[in-house]
Amino acid sequence: MTVKNKWKMSKNPLFRGDRKDAVCVPSPEADDSIVRHIMYFEGPGRKTPYLSTSEEYELADNFSNGAVWQTFVKMAKAESVEHISRTELLALMKGNGKGKAKWPSAFEVMQARRYVEQWGEHLLDFRKVEDPAITTQIIFSKS
């Protein structure tokens, strides 16, 4: 599966497959490596300052554990959540990666890049958020 339509930050929602009762709460103080997050190192329940989202409902539904949630970039930014777009992620993931996507293995960076392309992935960055539990409740609604 690949993303087909041009996603527009100003009008299109971002979707997240998650639990039925609530969106997982990120940990702003956790390791902020983007490759570590996307590659899902350390498995379920790992601490991460990011929440993965997708441009398409159907793609997010693949990761659903009961519900697909949605938000808008404007809502997230209003609550001090930073948005890292798919385009930005792809630009960071070349060679051994750049910035927060820098990683010792160029192969793992390349694999993370493939996942971003495949799932139309965007990241919501909670590193500057004081109370991520409340913030996730404010910015996400069931779609």
Language-model features and meaning:
Residues 1-143:
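NAD-dependent ADP-ribosyltransferases
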